[in-house]
Amino acid sequence: MSKQELGNKLNGRDFINIGIYAAIYFVIVMALAMTGLIPIFLILLSSMVGIIGGIPFMLFLTKVKKPGMILIMSLIMGIMMFVTGMTWVPIPFSIVTGAIAELVYWNGRYKSMRSAILTTGIFPLWSCGNYLPLFLQKADYFAGRSNYGQEYIDTVVKLTPNWMYFVLLIATVICGIIGGFIGKALLKKHFERAGIA
């Protein structure tokens, strides 16, 4: 086995970094999820995750030098959604979107600021997996949420015609990119030390 192959293998430090930043990111997600008790904020959740979560995620990217780290963090998010009461759908969704984000950052050889910002735009798409049951299985989705009240349910239904899902995907990417630019501005010295330009 070559030194290059060994160098591309994830080690204990890499997994520690994944765990730390996944925990920070998850806390942000759960804090923002509380706003979902208001219908409009339920719809805006993935976009808010993109902006606010984009800041620590950009810092995480300064630690990413090997393939697999972004994908694993995305998968952790999908699994945590399932564990906290969502369906299984976010898990495969997080694998697909995490793999795309991984490829984008890898394409920049972990040194491109443009790739870092675009990756930060793509990464929060994992959270859109939470919306699929809402759009595709409304009756089942609200069956377990009757305690929210009929007015809440009616408002959410009005806000979520099927075409809105594609708007949410685009808005999430745009807001993630905004979060990337904010992270770039706030964490300039970290990127300089990591050699990302």
Report the location of each language-model feature.
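Short, charged juxtamembrane terminal tails flanking transmembrane helices
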Residues: M1-L6, G12, L187-A197
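Hydrophobic transmembrane alpha-helices
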Residues: S2-G68
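Membrane-interfacial segments
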Residues: L32, G36-I40, V64, G68, ...
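Hydrophobic alpha-helical transmembrane segments
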Residues: F15-I20, S47-M48, I70-L75, W88-P92, ...
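Membrane-embedded alpha-helical hairpins and interfacial helices in multi-pass inner-membrane proteins
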Residues: A116-K188
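Short helix-perturbing small/polar motifs within transmembrane alpha-helices
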Residues: V27, S94-G129, G180
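Alpha-helical membrane segments and adjacent membrane-interface helices in multi-pass membrane proteins
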Residues: I43-L103
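Aromatic-anchored segments of alpha-helical transmembrane domains
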Residues: A22-M30, I76-T84, I122-L132
